[in-house]
Amino acid sequence: MPDRHGRRHLAGVVLDLRGNPGGLLNEAINTASVFLDGGVVVTFERRGAQPLRLDASAGGDTRTPLAVLVDGGTASAAEVGTGALQDRNRAVVGGSQTFGKGSVQEPKVLSDGSAIEFTVGSYLTPAGRSLDGVG
């Protein structure tokens, strides 16, 4: 709808993350930053280390209504971003249960050139929820 000056504004945004297997954690934080004004997006917990809190950048749009669509193909970083927007009461989340990958893996290259991944930590949403195995 145009405002009184004739400018058009978004009535709302639908962020469709169905079938999104995740990707880079930084991109999840960048995406959440578009809709948040700073504050925690995710906490990374690693055995034997202090938890690392990762925050959104300041200045995101906190007013435009936001809905996030998810399904069983929504995983990893896509779940992290969704969890942040949900826990921070910034978005309505709809669809079906997500994949439930809230663990962090690091690869170790073996002497024969192959690699194996080890789980080294987990992600927690701003409310302290683990998504691992839950979605």
Model segments located where?
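A short, well-ordered alpha-helical element
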Residues: 1-11
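Short, glycine-/small-residue-enriched flexible loop/hinge segments at domain edges that mediate gating
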Residues: 10-23
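Flexible glycine-/small-residue-rich
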Residues: 17, 70, 120-122, 135
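Gly/Ser/Thr-rich loop/hinge elements
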Residues: 20-76, 103-108, 124
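Short, well-structured beta-strand/strand-turn elements
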Residues: 88-101
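Short acidic, Pro/Gly- and aromatic-enriched capping/linker segments at domain boundaries
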Residues: 112-122
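Conserved functional hotspot residues or short segments at active or partner-binding sites
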Residues: 115, 129-135
